[in-house]
Swiss-Prot record:
The gene is rps2401. Component of the ribosome, a large ribonucleoprotein complex responsible for the synthesis of proteins in the cell. The small ribosomal subunit (SSU) binds messenger RNAs (mRNAs) and translates the encoded message by selecting cognate aminoacyl-transfer RNA (tRNA) molecules. The large subunit (LSU) contains the ribosomal catalytic site termed the peptidyl transferase center (PTC), which catalyzes the formation of peptide bonds, thereby polymerizing the amino acids delivered by tRNAs into a polypeptide chain. It is found in: Cytoplasm. Component of the small ribosomal subunit (SSU). Mature yeast ribosomes consist of a small (40S) and a large (60S) subunit. The 40S small subunit contains 1 molecule of ribosomal RNA (18S rRNA) and at least 33 different proteins. The large 60S subunit contains 3 rRNA molecules (25S, 5.8S and 5S rRNA) and at least 46 different proteins. One of its GO terms (biological process) is cytoplasmic translational elongation. The lineage of its organism: Eukaryota, Fungi, Dikarya, Ascomycota, Taphrinomycotina. GO terms for molecular function: structural constituent of ribosome. It comes from Schizosaccharomyces pombe (strain 972 / ATCC 24843). GO terms for cellular component: cytosol; cytosolic small ribosomal subunit. This is Small ribosomal subunit protein eS24A. Gene3D superfamilies: 3.30.70.3370. Residues 105-117, 124-134 have a biased composition (Basic residues). There are 2 genes for eS24 in S.pombe.
């Protein structure tokens, strides 16, 4: 993280109901690449004297021409409040939760279609009806 990076916050609001502080973050980084989210979380944690693991930064967009990035930041009172209120995918991004393991799409479809097939006594009756119609 370079010292030439300036972080400003605006539209600061304390949200007691969700146990957090929320704000819009402006990052000035002229002539430099974008700041990483982890560096931003650490810097915001230092600015607001909180643990960096309770800080969430998202929605960062770099303005045309570079040098200026704007996004949102949420600073929770503690990590437990963060786990309670943050969406699961954001918790996965910062390492507070494990990603959901999904079954492959094709396997889900095959299972659905196998379940639709007639089996057992019903299968025998269906076979007899088809023979009677022939």
């Amino acid at each position: 993280m370079s010292e030439a990076v300036t972080i400003r916050t605006r539209k600061f609001m304390t949200n007691r109901l969700l146990q957090r502080k929320q704000m819009v973050v402006d990052i000035l980084h002229p002539g430099k690449a974008n700041i990483s989210k982890n560096d931003l979380r650490e810097k915001l944690g230092q600015m607001y004297k909180t643990d960096a693991s309770a800080v969430q930064a998202f929605g960062l967009r770099t303005h045309y021409g570079g040098g200026r990035t704007t996004g949102f930041a949420l600073i929770y009172d503690d990590v437990e409040a963060m786990k309670k209120f943050e969406p699961h995918y954001r918790l996965v991004r910062v390492g507070h939760a494990e990603p959901i393991q999904k079954v492959a799409r094709q396997q889900r479809k095959q299972r659905k279609n196998r379940g639709k097939k007639v089996f057992g006594t019903g299968k025998r009756l269906a076979k007899r009806k088809s023979k009677q119609q022939d």
